Amino acid sequence: ADIASSSRGLNADEQDLGLTPIVIAHDGIAVIVNDDNPVDNLSTEQLRDIYAGKITNWKEVGGEDLKIQVINRDEASGTREAFRTIVMDGTPFDRRSAVLSGTGQVRDVVSRSHGAIGYISLGFVESLNATTSVKAVSVNHVEASEKTVASGGYPISRDLYFFVKGTPSHQAQDY
């Protein structure tokens, strides 16, 4: 392959492989809850405490008296890595959270469970919102949108990459 894509940058082991990263887009990581959940904003500190297992009930963040069902991504996920770096900031994830392997799974579980919370790429919320009953909550009172990600205002965002090895072929450059 001439080009590889990734939702994360190179880790320490990969930096010695001679790969050149090319930023192709900026992506927001949307925090999603069930449409019926009245909570519409969470701070990064509240998110950290939810994913660390310190906040366990929605009433602690202005919602109903309902247990929070924490949905996490698997360790191979670039989305999880970005969320861990930006939101968790060195705080470990609670080992009791459900770990799912894909965006669709996270979205489906959150749409079926009134108390669930998850995180997915912003593009999947907007493109599939009509067929699922999830909503993206604001983070630090900033709405998750293409505009706020592009402006740098939305706090949970990352770069998306293409990687090439050495000098890219003409086909790769045209792509």
Q: Which residue ranges define each predicted feature?
A:
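Exported/periplasmic ABC-transporter solute-binding proteins
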Residues: 1-175
